[in-house]
From Swiss-Prot:
One of its GO terms (molecular function) is structural constituent of ribosome. SUPFAM superfamilies: dsRNA-binding domain-like (SSF54768), Ribosomal protein S5 domain 2-like (SSF54211). Keywords: Ribonucleoprotein, Ribosomal protein, RNA-binding, rRNA-binding. The lineage of its organism: Archaea, Methanobacteriati, Methanobacteriota, Stenosarchaea group, Methanomicrobia. This is Small ribosomal subunit protein uS5.
Length: 208
């Protein structure tokens, strides 16, 4: 999405990005400064894509009566390692989606990819480097390295998350109530984050 031309940065990192002193996401991450403005992501990742995973109507009873809001769950990514998941609520669907997109941008992370399948030795970053598992609520998702050309063997929600992260080939195992789109997406996103927990050997690192 295009960033607002009238954006006035309020954070130190935002000012550095606006001044051109930080010109890439790699530099932003290495700076150690928190990303608190979605416009930073708009400027550093102009090819970022977003997709709505789920929209639910939630209700809450108050003293003044029943309050109804819409909860939107959105995934963003550039299909090349950067991916973020966000959710937000609002009384209208449109604002809920926009808030969820901003939340996903602020939660964006870089996922290391590799060629971790014993059936493949291409050395390209097309799958996860090793088996990882993520959990959210009752849902558990395990990502298993797959050979190049297999594709994504996963449910619809998990596939959307993995595609935005740039994963092209992977086996998956799921447990729990995967009909819950929110927890299914969160568990898949958590599994991707587990890749960054372990230190990667040299042969698993992506090409520059």
């Amino acid at each position: 999405m295009a960033f607002d031309e009238e954006w006035i940065p309020k954070t130190r990192l935002g000012k550095l990005v606006m001044e051109g002193q930080v010109a890439s996401m790699e530099e932003a991450i290495k700076s150690g400064l928190p990303i608190r403005e979605p416009q930073i992501i708009d400027m550093l990742l102009p090819d970022l894509e977003d997709e709505v995973l789920d929209i639910n109507m939630v209700q809450r009873m108050t003293d003044s009566g029943r309050r109804v809001k819409f909860r939107a769950t959105v995934i963003v990514g550039n299909r090349n390692g950067y991916v973020g998941l966000g959710q937000a609520k609002d009384v209208q669907v449109g604002p809920a989606i926009r808030k969820a997109i901003d939340a996903a941008k602020l939660d964006i992370t870089y996922i290391h990819r590799g060629c971790g399948s014993w059936e493949c030795a291409c050395g390209l970053p097309h799958t996860v480097p090793y088996e990882v598992t993520g959990k959210a609520g009752s849902v558990s998702v395990t990502l298993i390295p797959a050979p190049r050309g297999l594709g994504i063997a996963a449910g619809n929600t998990a596939t959307k998350v993995l595609e935005k992260a740039g994963i092209k080939d992977v086996w998956t195992k799921t447990f729990g109530t995967t009909r819950s789109t929110l927890n299914f997406a969160k568990a898949t996103f958590d599994a991707l984050n587990q890749v960054n927990v372990m230190r990667l050997p040299v042969y698993c690192k992506e090409e520059a």
